[in-house]
Amino acid sequence: MSEPADLHAAVLEALVGEFGRYKRTAERALDQLRDEDFFVRLNDRQNSIYVIVKHMAGNMRSRWTDFLTSDGEKPDRHRDDEFIEQSVPREQILRMWEEGWQCTFAALSELREGDLLKTVTIRGEPMTAVSAITRQVAHYAHHVGQIILIANHIKGPDWKWLTIPPGQSETYSRRMQGK
């Protein structure tokens, strides 16, 4: 493999890895919730986890469908509707979540050497594909953080930590360095 191909593969692997890490982390938070918890709003200006998931799924479908060949803001996306609360079953929420991620990973798996430097557009704004992808990593990380914050708030003392629990950093570091 050539150096550019190696770099392309390494960058793409790192980006896909980050998307996967955020997906898994959010799912570990979602798994802790009761059905009704998906609709809790911390205040009247905050979104529920359901709305965040619906928004992320809509964004993923729009951004990743025909990623290299069409604007990332599809004409049939109604973004404002993503922020409307509805009562839907947990299974439907998780299906939206999974379909959004499937669209994301499918688009990323189709990228080939040289594609990261191609120009794509989002809302008419041109950028390199790698810029658009890193923008999405940041966007999804933001919303995954919101999901975790809300879930942690809901669960209170029953929250199961998704990362190193408070007071466990030194033990964790010693264990990892001993591997």
Predicted regions and their residues:
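Short, charged, low-complexity loops and linkers
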Residues: S2-V16, I84-Q86, Q92
